[in-house]
Each structure stands twice: as structure tokens, then as C-alpha cells.
UniProtKB/Swiss-Prot annotation:
Gene this chain is encoded by: sucD2
Active site: H246
Organism of derivation: Archaeoglobus fulgidus (strain ATCC 49558 / DSM 4304 / JCM 9628 / NBRC 100126 / VC-16)
Name of the protein in question: Succinate--CoA ligase [ADP-forming] subunit alpha 2
GO molecular function: nucleotide binding; succinate-CoA ligase (ADP-forming) activity; succinate-CoA ligase (GDP-forming) activity
Enzyme nomenclature, EC number: 6.2.1.5
Cellular component terms per the entry's GO annotation: succinate-CoA ligase complex (ADP-forming)
Quaternary structure annotation from Swiss-Prot or TrEMBL: Heterotetramer of two alpha and two beta subunits.
Keywords: Ligase, Nucleotide-binding, Tricarboxylic acid cycle
Function: Succinyl-CoA synthetase functions in the citric acid cycle (TCA), coupling the hydrolysis of succinyl-CoA to the synthesis of either ATP or GTP and thus represents the only step of substrate-level phosphorylation in the TCA. The alpha subunit of the enzyme binds the substrates coenzyme A and phosphate, while succinate binding and nucleotide specificity is provided by the beta subunit.
Length: 287
């Protein structure tokens, strides 16, 4: 079993008529993702790559029975798109958009929680259950079906580690890019809990980075897990006070250093790799 999304997931693409929306819709369709609808206000009644376009998510749910959404909408309008999906009854919302204002992120975070939906992102590469479905912008050719779950704050590091696992013959059950902003819809612990309960997943890779306390909080949960966890923390040489790529990747007041996160993960029983290749090798040792 995959977590969050699988071959039964019916997807609506919000922003399907834009360049990014159309480009990634084609890639997702080629992978086998069941894209049943697109949404762009004012473009209802048209088609993109054979996918019917509606004016609203509510209409897409009613007409095409969509139950998941992937959002390619510019930052000023992305929060409204997320909240529209939640209000329409969509249960899995993947927001790729970067640069959403913090107050907008807070509003959409709580609206999604109130609706009982799952939000992946924002500012994330999406989610893939290899061989089943893909919602997002990941390079699908590097993944293969298997029993290693990956949860990550970093897109490119996810790709590196997944590629290395695949090279070693280790496939993935589901790969979740939770996003690099300070406010995200789904955190490490929520995904770790799903992997812990998933019969198909035999080991988990956690990819963290400097900033915040998410990895330390995850370490507390890892203590209680029955499945082995291998970690990687980016930013070992990052200078304090300087944002390193993601809005959440900043060390402030001595909190959020790579050293503190590595120490917490190791104390919880996780093994921590120094390089993406070493992470894959540690997983191979365990399995």
C-alpha cells in the first residue's frame, strides 16, 4: 500500500491552462496519473490535453468526481486556490507554489485543517507513489516501486537520495516532499505515522535541513517507531542568520542547527548519513 495517494486517486489540476500547469499535467498524464479535470476561472468548457476544464473546483468535484488537487497557481492567488479546494471537499491538496505570503499560508493552513483535508506543501515538489500515481513536479524516471518511504523538506535532495536508492535496487513506497516554508500543511510526524502504519513500507528516510525544530520533534516520534529510520540533515556548514534557499532554512538564536538535529535523530535511534549516497547505503544495510 502507498500512503496518501495511489492509483485510485482522481486529480484536478488548478491552474491547468498556464504554462507550468500544462507542462506538468502532460508529464503526470504520461506517468499514468488519473487527471480527471482542470480548473481555471473563465476557461470552463475548454480542454487541455484532453482534460476537461471547469471554472471552479466545486464543479470539477461534481462533474468529474475529483478527490485530490495539485495547484500550479501564482503566489498571490495560491492560498485562495487551496481554500477553494478544501471548501469543495477535496481531501488531498498538493500546493507546488513558492513565495506565498505568510499570512496567506496561515489562513489556508487552518481552513484545510477545519475541512479535514491533507495539504502537502506549499513550496514543495509534490508526492509520488511509484508505479501508481504522481502529483507534482518530480523527475519520475528516478523512482521505482518498493518498500522505502521518503519524507523530505528538500526537493533536490529527495531526488538525489531516491536516485541512489534506485541504483542500489531499493524502490520506494511513497515519496513525500512536505515543503521548505515555515508554515506547511503536513509535517514530518504526520507522514512518519502513516509510514509506520503502512504494511508495504519497511524503512523510512527522513531528509531534513537547518531551521526550526521539526527534525527534533520528529526524533521524539521516531523513538516510538518499530520501523528503522535513516536521516540526512542539510546545512552542516551553513552560517547562522542567513536564509539558505528555503524560508524555513535559517539558524536563529542557536536553535535549528544541523548538529542539534543530527544529535536528536541519533539519540532517537535513527542512523544519519553524511551524504545522499551514504543514506542509500545505510538503508541497504538495514534491509
Amino acid at each position: 500500500m502507498a500512503i496518501i495517494v495511489d492509483e485510485r486517486t482522481k486529480v484536478v489540476v488548478q491552474g491547468i491552462t498556464g504554462y507550468q500547469g500544462k507542462f506538468h499535467t502532460e508529464r503526470m498524464l504520461n506517468y499514468g496519473t488519473k487527471i480527471v479535470a482542470g480548473v481555471t476561472p473563465g476557461k470552463g468548457g475548454t480542454e487541455v490535453l484532453g482534460v476537461p476544464v471547469y471554472d471552479s473546483v466545486k464543479e470539477a468535484v461534481r462533474e468529474a468526481d475529483a478527490n485530490a488537487s495539485v495547484i500550479f497557481v501564482p503566489a498571490p492567488f495560491a492560498a485562495d486556490a487551496v481554500m477553494e479546494a478544501a471548501d469543495a471537499g477535496i481531501k488531498v491538496i498538493v500546493c507546488i507554489t513558492e513565495g506565498i505570503p505568510v499570512h496567506d499560508e496561515l489562513k489556508m493552513y487552518w481552513r484545510v485543517k477545519e475541512a479535514g483535508a491533507t495539504l502537502i506543501g506549499p513550496n514543495c515538489p509534490g508526492i509520488i507513489s511509484p508505479g501508481k500515481t504522481h502529483l507534482g513536479i518530480m523527475p519520475v524516471q528516478i523512482f521505482k516501486p518498493g518498500n522505502v518511504g521518503i519524507v523530505s523538506r528538500s526537493g533536490t535532495l529527495t531526488y538525489q537520495i531516491a536516485y541512489n536508492l534506485t541504483k542500489l535496487g531499493l524502490g520506494q513506497s511513497t515519496v513525500v516532499g512536505i515543503g521548505g516554508d515555515r508554515i506547511i500543511g503536513t509535517d514530518f510526524v504526520e507522514v512518519l505515522r502513516l509510514f509506520e502504519d503502512d504494511k508495504e513500507t519497511k524503512a523510512v528516510v527522513l531528509v531534513g535541513e537547518i531551521g526550526g525544530r521539526d527534525e527534533e520533534v520528529a526524533a521524539e516520534f521516531i523513538r516510538e517507531m518499530s520501523k528503522p529510520v535513516v536521516g540526512y540533515v542539510a546545512g552542516l556548514t551553513a552560517p547562522p542568520g542567513k536564509r539558505m534557499g528555503h524560508a524555513g532554512a535559517i539558524i536563529e538564536g542557536g536553535v535549528g542547527t544541523a548538529e542539534s538535529k543530527i544529535k536528536a535523530l541519533e539519540a532517537a535511534g535513527a542512523r544519519v548519513g553524511k551524504t545522499p549516497m551514504e543514506v542509500a547505503e545505510l538503508v541497504a544495510e538495514i534491509l
